[in-house]
Amino acid sequence: MKCPFCQHDDTQVLDTRISEEGDSIRRRRRCVSCDKRFTTYERIELAMPVIVKKNGSRTDFDPKKLQASLQLALRKRPVSAEAVDAAIHRIEQKLLSSGEREVVSGQIGELVMRELQRLDKIAYIRFASVYKSFEDVAEFQDAIAEVGRERKPPSK
């Protein structure tokens, strides 16, 4: 690795440690030319899939958009910021673990709906009404009935 002080190409690793989280490696290095020491970090770089929109255009995944969508649906609902962050993390993990380079936007919408269904039924209905483009009251009633069926314990 190139020395940041003298730009010499040869450095020596003095110490290597894994971070507490286990997701990075810290290396203490010494330049063989100028004898100065410096620290480097190695981390895994994971690329989120590209999002393919309904019109066919492609855009980079933006976690801020995901957060804004969840927060809008959850506006004035009793759900903590930590729960929202955890939901975003689960969605990101599902996208990463899919191994796909591209994901259609509809898949993200479905993941958001699943998370909202777990977090808050009212927020789920809010999001579903926009995401599924509800046209009339009957579609709201169907969605509410579906949520209600999921809450009832099975009869014996």
UniProtKB/Swiss-Prot annotation:
GO terms for molecular function: ATP binding; DNA binding; zinc ion binding. A zinc finger (unnamed) spans 3-34. Binds 1 zinc ion. One of its GO terms (biological process) is negative regulation of DNA-templated transcription. Keywords: ATP-binding, DNA-binding, Metal-binding, Nucleotide-binding, Repressor, Transcription, Transcription regulation, Zinc, Zinc-finger. Coiled coil: none annotated. Its cofactor is Zn(2+). It comes from the Bacteria. Residues 49-139 form the ATP-cone domain. Negatively regulates transcription of bacterial ribonucleotide reductase nrd genes and operons by binding to NrdR-boxes. HAMAP family: NrdR (MF_00440). PANTHER family: TRANSCRIPTIONAL REPRESSOR NRDR (PTHR30455:SF2). Belongs to the NrdR family. This is Transcriptional repressor NrdR. It comes from Herminiimonas arsenicoxydans. The gene is nrdR.
